[in-house]
Amino acid sequence: MKVSHWLIPLALATAWPIQSLQAQTQEASTQAPKLVVSIVVDQMRADYLTRFEDLYTGGIQTLMSEGESFINAHYSHAPTYTGPGHATIYTGTDPRFHGIIANDWYDASLKRSVYCVEDDQVAPVGSSSDAHRRSPKNIRSTTWTDELEWATQGKAKVIAFSIKDRGAICAAGHYGDAAYWIDSDAGFVSSSHYMDDLPKWMMRFNRSHDPSSYMTGSWDRLLDVSHYDALAGPDQSDFERVPKGAKSATFPYDLKAMQSAYNGAFKSTPAGNTLLVDAALVAVKAEGLGQDDITDVLAISFSATDYLGHAMGPRSQEVMDMYLRLDLDLKHLFESLDLLVGKGNYLVTFTADHGASDNPMQAKADGFPAELWAPADLEAELRVLMHLALIDNDKVLNLSNDQIYLSSREKDLAVAVRNAILVHPAIAEAWTWEEIRLSPDPYAQLRRNGSDKRSGQVFYALKPGHLAYGPTGTTHGSGYHYDSHVPLIFMGKAFNPQAMHNERAYIRDMAPTLSKVIGIASPSACTGNPLWVSPANK
């Protein structure tokens, strides 16, 4: 269990770059809300806002009509994954400084991959599985939620929910009150970093809201099929993965059969989103979030959109329908918060941790330049090229995250590897870490993600539309627009309804924006810039 959770260690409080010692206090901001609702939709491309705009009638429509939108918001790093994306949202800096360079990375000293939120020094809470030994120890910066705890001497309540552990932990930060994520058997769980035992209200929720209880009946299209035919691809597609327990990747789906075949099936259906909203609203009531003048935080990372996106791809009718149903889940969330906290008393942020590519084979069939490699095949082919360049295989420790880890940091070895792989038809460009570290743009995205201790010695970028993945669904990770461009909306009394900004904004700007609105210091490694100007200065 956390000890004096608002006493931030010196190592985090002084992380580079050093913040002003004259920290703002929460009382300095007249715009501070009673509750910040931080929403992240995993794998939501920016074009999902406009593509389905005429069909949104709920929470997403409310965000677009009542929020202030930054329609050219991007991640400034690559690779673009869930871990780095969430860490960037909450720390206000890039992976180079917050340290979460990928969902996992190779550690040469341990001779294995390290998961971004793994921690064998903590115990699982709510489950006996070692898979839930998780904490934020690998995040090198404070988060804006940490700074809120610091500014209020621990009086603020910070509670985060996600299906994925990393989605909740990056939001709760080092000193949040709770991070909850899903175990398919036990329900919501946490770790001893945040608590000794699940609170009684969560135990009751897990007993009464087993994930399988959401998987009854059938999942069919919310609207008439004509809408889906107009805005998505055909329902029958060779580029979509058939779920376990289903006969085909077409509507309608027998949810009970899917859940019986695989107890994690709910994670890739709209039920996964509904479960999170239900749990979050119980937490608001049980923990009294937003009930006094000290700003609290409710963070929700919707993971089902990512699970489904990986299986079906962005042109699928299933993905389209999930977003239309998420729109209704968010409507329920906002209407409930209007009653529980008061309309105008809470601030909402809305973004995504990354986008997604079209399925390369689907794009290729439609005449676009694209190609697909099985990940194992691409690695094998790159190793052959290095072998042909007389590079010993034992000098190549690992290939992951579009990086190559070598047994030494010799410049000549890295250059030889770079030159060897450049001839592969999937590779657009390759660089040594030294080249990236010392050079300006166009290496900026990679430089912002690189870390002397956690990154490889050679980086490479696949060509646009080229993926190392399976034949169905899609993935993400590049620095191209389809992966970096995401929604960014702020909704609350501090922001201008329906205001729309075309200039480039970065997701690392979110944390300093919220810090300024709330009246707290920015996170310790923050490199972003506030997007908000006080009404008094407009």
What positions do the PLM features span?
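Active-site regions of oxyanion-processing enzymes, predominantly non-cytosolic
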Residues: V36, W150, K155-S162, A168-A171, ...
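Non-catalytic, well-ordered alpha-helical segments in soluble enzyme domains
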Residues: T62, S141-W150, N401-W431, K493, ...
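Short, structured active-site-proximal loop/turn typified by the sulfatase FGly-forming signature C/S-X-P-X-R
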Residues: T50-F97, K157-F161
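Secreted, luminal/periplasmic, and some membrane-associated catalytic domains
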Residues: Y81, N103-R133, S141, D146, ...
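Long, low-complexity, polar/charged, intrinsically disordered or flexibly structured peripheral segments
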Residues: P211-V282
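Active-site-proximal N-terminal segment of extracellular/periplasmic enzymes that hydrolyze or transfer
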Residues: Q24-E68
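Active-site His/acidic residue clusters
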Residues: I169-A178, Y253-G264, S268, Q291-L326, ...
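A long, amphipathic alpha-helix that forms part
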Residues: F266-D292, T305-Y346, L514
